[in-house]
Amino acid sequence: MTGLFYRKEINEDKFLKIGLIYDLKTSLESSTFSQLERRIPNSLNVLVIDTIANDISREYIIPKNYGFGISYEILDRLSFGIDLRFQPWKENSGYEGQDNSYKNFLQISSGFEIIPDAEDVNSYFKRVTYRGGLLFKRYPYLINGEETNNIAATFGLSLPVGSISRINLGFEIGKRGS
């Protein structure tokens, strides 16, 4: 995967960040062996009846991948952003010689992070980082001819432990499927 990242300083503690990713299409090669066999009752022996496929090589294409993200940050206070990812699976036919239909993969996610006061030594909860987000994914595969989508809300906390350590907790609630 290849990417570009640009960070623009708006002023001393405010930043605009932009990122792009691109991944070339790749292929997976596999070989298939399939045989028809019969198990002999009350025995560990197997009777091979017929070899259906022996060492058939196949190629499976994983399509290229594009992504774009933009975020705004106020240092040690606030950050929010949005990411988009796209993968053109629709042009992929799956294994060579098989009729597979795919949809294009799409992911849209957005989120925020708030730290009320990172330097307040008198209030633990003002140093906690609070996170939230929304997510939509359209998966490339079909189940029973139907699209499979994922819609979710995410929540998280980053709890300070000592002077430099943190415990991160994340939760996701949503629906996958149609």
Can you say where each PLM-predicted feature lies in the sequence?
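Outer-membrane beta-barrel porins/channels
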Residues: M1-S178
